[in-house]
């Protein structure tokens, strides 16, 4: 068995499964697997074979992202946004904007180009990869330039959602785009002032055959327009050579210098006699719905840490007598941008920040009430996230206060999230941490803390049994299989918590599925968890939070630690 177990450890370490496997988890899983096979298969020659087959099932099949069951989900979930209309209208509008200039448009792409889960939550029907799919419709006309700030390279700035540095994300983005047939022309390093780490990153990219351009730090940016729009300002920057009509400027995160890159390119294009244009593409705030619409309020909640504020665009109101929505940073910087355009082009082609945008999302809302309710739910989730961050020492009171105000403006209460009162009531009944999940059809399932399982693990098994039509009193994992894992955790690995975490529970269920048909049936329900809502009566360990995230469950937690747990500063 030694060689085969070594192979299993390799599988665990090399695959992204239900969890980030550490030594403790590996030991527990191997122990469980060996225990299950030892007690269920008597033929010695078959033991090794079945152990490997179990691990192939667990790690090869279930590590892959489950395909979305479009028909089932679309029947169950209310749709408020027409995604097909959006893809068609948005791509047509960008083509129209290209034609207004000298067949050359620099498009600043704000927000997430793919995996835009915020948009998919507040605009039900919006697909997380909609913006990427829209660009793919323009793939013959488009090339992408990825921008990264030299100070961010120097500081090893990390993307909070992915946990990787900005420079590593540049390579990830390149791979993502090219794998989908989009052309990435180059990488641009902005705000360069001789940083050694930026030089090293540039050399690294060039060794990979990637073109790299540099934009320098300009004193007095962005207010000193006379210097900026001159040979001593933008003129010192590299001219990024592009070959296609649409140049999409994107970045790993905000503050990378996307707009500066666009304007620098305009300066160089006009010097070369090319009347190129600029436009901005951001989904939120949506300019043609009310300022206090829950969809726009949800955007404020999502950016509460940045202190962004939605506001009426005063320039658009003055120019057209029309009320539109923008956010404070674009409104505040517009006079400066306007002055730069005038110096570069001779006149500014836009009368307002709203004019610069090309976003068509507001025209594709087909059920406003569905989008309003989805956005209220998002604000509630953001509130719990901000409270948990405050308790963990990573958030601020100001962020919490702002989202509390947004809740009031959206006329939402915490009890509007159905899983919240369900989890709290279950905790009250049992006197221990509890959890609740809302299925797509509205059913509420709860889980309690037991000697064997934590509340999240109990909830998971109860939900899977409910979806599979299995009696809740039946065991899909034998208690005899759980006890040895607990013994290993507490007696040999130094854990003070004998209860199974969600990842351990999922692996134990996967192993049981090899010999138990009902466990196999429960295992097949995992894809149905995506998009479900869950709430726990205490803050969870990072292991369980990660498990919920990987299952696609939208989780919130009460902002309190489990009694007896040590606070971490």
Regions found by a protein language model. Name each.
Residues 2, 27-28, 33, 60:
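Cysteine-centered motifs
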Residues 5, 14, 25, 46, ...:
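Cationic, low-complexity basic patches in intrinsically disordered or flexible, solvent-exposed regions
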Residues 16, 34, 39-43, 48-49, ...:
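Intrinsic-disorder-associated, low-complexity terminal segments enriched in Asp/Asn/His/Tyr and depleted
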Residues 71-250, 264-424, 432, 439-441, ...:
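Flexible phosphate-sensing "switch/lid" loops adjacent to ATP/NTP-binding sites
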Residues 256-257:
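Conserved glycine(s) of the Walker
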Residues 261:
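Hydrophobic positions on the alpha1 helix immediately C-terminal to the Walker A/P-loop
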Residues 452-468:
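A short, polar/charged loop-to-alpha-helix boundary motif
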């Amino acid at each position: 068995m030694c060689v085969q177990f070594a192979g299993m450890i390799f599988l665990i370490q090399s695959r992204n499964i239900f969890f980030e496997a550490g030594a403790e988890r590996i030991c527990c899983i191997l122990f469980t697997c060996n225990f299950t096979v030892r007690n269920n298969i008597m033929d010695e020659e078959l033991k090794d074979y079945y152990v490997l087959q179990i691990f192939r099932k667990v790690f090869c099949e279930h590590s892959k992202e489950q395909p979305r069951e479009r028909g089932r989900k679309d029947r169950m979930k209310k749709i408020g946004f027409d995604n097909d209309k959006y893809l068609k209208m948005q791509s047509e509008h960008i083509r129209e904007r290209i034609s207004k200039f000298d067949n050359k448009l620099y498009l600043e792409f704000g927000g997430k180009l793919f995996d835009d889960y915020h948009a998919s939550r507040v605009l039900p029907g919006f697909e997380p990869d909609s913006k990427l799919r829209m660009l793919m419709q323009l793939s013959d006309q488009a090339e992408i330039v990825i921008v990264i700030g030299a100070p961010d390279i120097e500081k090893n700035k990390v993307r909070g959602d992915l946990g990787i540095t900005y420079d590593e994300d540049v390579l990830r983005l390149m791979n993502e785009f090219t794998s989908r047939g989009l052309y990435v022309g180059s990488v641009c390093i902005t705000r360069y002032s001789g940083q050694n780490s930026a030089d090293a990153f540039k050399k690294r990219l060039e060794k990979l055959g990637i073109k790299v351009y540099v934009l320098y730090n300009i004193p007095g940016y962005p207010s000193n327009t006379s210097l900026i729009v001159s040979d001593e300002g933008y003129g010192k920057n590299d001219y990024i050579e592009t070959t296609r009509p649409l140049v999409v400027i994107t970045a790993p995160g905000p503050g990378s210098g996307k707009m500066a890159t666009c304007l620098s390119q305009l300066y160089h294009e006009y010097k070369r006699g090319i009347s190129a244009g600029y436009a901005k593409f951001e989904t939120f705030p949506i300019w043609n719905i009310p300022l206090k619409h829950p969809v726009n309020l949800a955007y404020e909640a999502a950016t509460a840490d940045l202190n962004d504020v939605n506001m009426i665009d005063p320039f658009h109101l003055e120019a057209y007598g029309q009320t539109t929505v923008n956010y404070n940073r674009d409104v505040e910087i517009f006079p400066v941008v306007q002055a730069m355009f005038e110096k570069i082009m001779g006149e500014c082609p836009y009368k307002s920040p709203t004019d610069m945008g090309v976003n068509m999302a507001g025209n594709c809302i087909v059920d406003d009430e569905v989008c309003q309710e989805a956005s209220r739910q998002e604000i509630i989730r953001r509130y719990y996230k901000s409270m948990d961050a405050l308790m963990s020492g990573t958030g601020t009171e100001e962020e919490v206060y702002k989202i509390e105000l947004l809740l009031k403006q959206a006329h939402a209460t915490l009890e509007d999230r159905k899983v919240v009162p369900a989890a709290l009531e279950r905790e009250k009944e049992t006197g221990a941490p509890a959890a609740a999940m809302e299925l797509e059809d509205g059913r509420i399932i709860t889980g309690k803390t037991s000697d064997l399982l934590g509340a999240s693990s109990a909830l998971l098994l109860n939900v899977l049994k409910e979806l599979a039509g299995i009696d809740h009193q039946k065991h899909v994992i034998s208690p005899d299989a759980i006890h040895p894992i607990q013994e290993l955790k507490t007696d040999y690995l130094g854990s003070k918590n004998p209860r199974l975490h969600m990842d351990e529970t999922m692996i134990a269920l996967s192993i049981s599925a090899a010999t138990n048909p009902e466990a196999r049936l429960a295992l097949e329900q995992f894809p149905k968890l995506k998009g479900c809502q869950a709430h726990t009566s205490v803050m969870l360990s990072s292991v369980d939070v990660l498990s919920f995230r990987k299952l696609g469950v939208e989780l919130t937690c009460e902002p309190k630690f489990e009694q007896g747990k040590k606070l971490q500063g």
